[in-house]
């Protein structure tokens, strides 16, 4: 499949890369890392990375603005996005051919060409693997691409602490870090936290609920976000902070936005992506998300999570 992707990429003069809404480091790393590789390899081609910028990650890369006409005859590549409704910039079907590169379970097999590898730690890891295959075809990796891909791997592996970190992951990271970017500066930019977000994190620890079966939950409503001067995105990024609490088997964050309640599931053992799918979401076995539209649904999610944790005893 990698060879077919490389061959297809070589055929198009215009290539537009997308990723998911509310991007994380892996979304930026895979989309923009591949953008840099292709620009370095094919300077004669028109290569664009599109989507709504995420302010906390804007230091990684500047995205492009593309008019509708540019999609005519273009190859569109979507990175790190399992479901079509989560693709940032819904013009993605407007090109001549659509390619999906992802590491989530392939529940929505959209696109003309698909490369899905659920064993990969991140799509950024997959992009580096694609580059290694592409080297035989003249592909080039510059320092910016290496930094972006490394950032994506770091983000999705939780700084190499999550169980999705493999021998291959560490091998690739070791090769990427040989490029002349500052990994320490990158870590500082990725993980430096504003004081108001730290205070919100304190609120989270003070208000977490934990059942005897190991199901934990936190509710962050709009008035709480306003009190601490934080965004829903900043609050959602704190979901991993509960992972070190003794006795937790799985947990859920509810973050209220203007038109929905964002739900973030995490687990130390029970498989939770089936629960996320039940509420029109999805994701990985131990890290998933969904969106709901009433607090009654939140109560049902808590009941389901409780059952899931109890059955995992």
From Swiss-Prot:
EC number per UniProt: 3.1.-.-, 3.1.3.7
Essential cofactor(s): Mn(2+)
Keyword Nuclease: yes
InterPro entries in the cross-refs: DDH_dom (IPR001667), DHH_sf (IPR038763), DHHA1_dom (IPR003156), Oligoribo/pAp-PDE_c-di-AMP_PDE (IPR051319)
Catalyzed reaction equations: adenosine 3',5'-bisphosphate + H2O = AMP + phosphate
Keyword Cytoplasm in annotation: no
Record's keyword terms, sorted: Exonuclease, Hydrolase, Nuclease
Pfam families: DHH (PF01368), DHHA1 (PF02272)
GO molecular function, one term: 3'(2'),5'-bisphosphate nucleotidase activity
Signal peptide: none
Domain of life: Bacteria
Enzyme class: hydrolase
Coiled coil: none
Complex formation: Tetramer.
Protein's job: Bifunctional enzyme which has both oligoribonuclease and pAp-phosphatase activities. Degrades RNA and DNA oligonucleotides with a length of 5 nucleotides and shorter, with a preference for 3-mers. Directionality is controversial; shown to degrade 5-mers and less in a 3' to 5' direction, and 11-mers in a 5' to 3' direction. Converts 3'(2')-phosphoadenosine 5'-phosphate (PAP) to AMP.
Similarity comment: Belongs to the NrnA oligoribonuclease family.
Note: In accordance with its dual activities, is able to complement both orn and cysQ mutants in E.coli.
Record's protein name: Bifunctional oligoribonuclease and PAP phosphatase NrnA
